[in-house]
């Protein structure tokens, strides 16, 4: 199935998370200084390094250097993994002086993760041989933390259709269409999904006719 338009949907808005502003009394990307508990300076530095890597990935994405952008996003996610409470909480009893993020830092961590996974999916859809399983995986990670994200719903739908599950793909694309009812690519892939479901239904009917009669 042709992939025209699947990768570039929303590209006119640029990569996710581009152009963050600083607020009064805040550090880079709006993260407040201090107040995060043991190891806070190291955690702050690691968080800001991840934000920087994501920004570098965004620049590479805009330059169509998708492979290099993927590397930057992966590096950002690796840095964030060491700070993610979902990952580090089970280890707190074994590791002394584990940094505890402030609520604002944790929000920045999560939004940076979401942006990186969204942008990784976009990069993968630009490659000559698309890894649709990975596109779906990344898009579902976005939806876990940012329910209703239209780009993630759309990409999950495209990937799921390509992986041979038009019924589930239709669910994702219908949700995406509620957020972007006039988007040409969403409507295109929703139509392709309906055609695939109709074709599968006709094949099933023909199979049963052959079996019984």
Annotate each predicted stretch with a short phrase.
Residues 5, 131-137, 194, 199-213:
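Intrinsically disordered, low-complexity, charge-biased linker/tail regions
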Residues 63, 127-129, 163, 197:
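Structural motif corresponding to the intra-repeat A-B loop/turn of tetratricopeptide repeats
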Residues 66-67, 130-132, 166:
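TPR-repeat structural position
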Residues 79-152:
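Alpha-helical adaptor scaffolds
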Residues 83-87, 150-151, 179-192, 201-202:
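Boundary/linker segments of alpha-helical solenoid repeat arrays
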């Amino acid at each position: 199935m042709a992939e025209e338009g699947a990768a570039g949907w929303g590209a006119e808005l640029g990569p996710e998370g581009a152009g963050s502003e600083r607020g009064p009394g805040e550090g880079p990307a709006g993260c407040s200084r201090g107040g995060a508990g043991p190891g806070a300076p190291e955690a702050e530095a690691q968080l800001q390094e991840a934000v920087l890597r994501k920004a570098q990935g965004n620049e590479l994405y805009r330059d169509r250097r998708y492979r290099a952008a993927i590397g930057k996003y992966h590096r950002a996610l690796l840095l964030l993994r060491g700070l993610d409470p979902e990952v580090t909480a089970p280890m707190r009893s074994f590791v002394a002086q584990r940094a505890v993020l402030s609520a604002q830092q944790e929000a920045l961590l999560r939004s940076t993760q979401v942006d990186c996974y969204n942008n990784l999916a976009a990069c993968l859809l630009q490659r000559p041989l698309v890894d649709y399983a990975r596109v779906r995986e990344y898009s579902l990670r976005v939806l876990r933390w940012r329910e209703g994200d239209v780009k993630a719903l759309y990409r999950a739908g495209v990937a799921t259709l390509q992986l041979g599950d038009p019924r589930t793909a239709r669910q994702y694309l219908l949700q995406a269409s509620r957020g972007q009812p006039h988007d040409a690519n969403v409507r295109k892939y929703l139509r392709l999904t309906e055609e695939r479901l109709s074709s599968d239904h006709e094949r099933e009917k023909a199979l049963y006719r052959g079996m019984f009669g």
